[in-house]
């Protein structure tokens, strides 16, 4: 039996065999996975029980801002200021955002601040060593968040094709290997 974690590692290794750190930001959780030179999982850390820093978090924030979740990337790209969104809880973040709106902070800057908050949460989970791969729906639908992350760590982050399916692809590779393919 293969775990979700090992399947993400296998799928990522197929595309980026030199990567040693994987960041997966999905709908319900986010994780940092460390792999060895053969793509085997050696360690992983997962976000807290709170949804903050996940795709569900971004959907909730989009609802609170009364924008479609698909517009978040476009808004963040057009931001002109860096603002801090510091809360670690979706409920508290929503309250913090309402305060920013009342203070007439531009919506674009708020969304950029939310992206920075997601990145900060990931970086607090574990160090990112060597080449870094990002998978999950957040990477698929928020390419500007990936670029912001690259700026934060000072190096390129590799994103596989259809990153939201990397774990499923890894599972398929394991199944193929088990059949002798």
Q: Which residues does each predicted region cover?
A:
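Glycine-rich phosphate-binding/hydrolytic loop that grips phosphoryl groups
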Residues: 55-58, 160-181
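Glycine-rich phosphate-binding loops at beta-strand->alpha-helix junctions
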Residues: 123-152, 163-164
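Glycine-rich phosphate-binding loop plus the immediately following alpha-helix
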Residues: 38-81, 173
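Conserved phosphate-binding/catalytic loops in two-lobed NTP-binding clefts
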Residues: 4-5, 150-169
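General beta-strand structural signal in soluble alpha/beta enzymes
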Residues: 1-5, 21-25, 43-44, 71, ...
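Conserved phosphate-binding catalytic cores of ATP/NTP-utilizing and phosphoryl-transfer enzymes
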Residues: 1-26, 31-40, 123, 170-177
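Adenine-nucleotide phosphate-binding core of ATP-dependent small-molecule kinases
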Residues: 90-128, 164
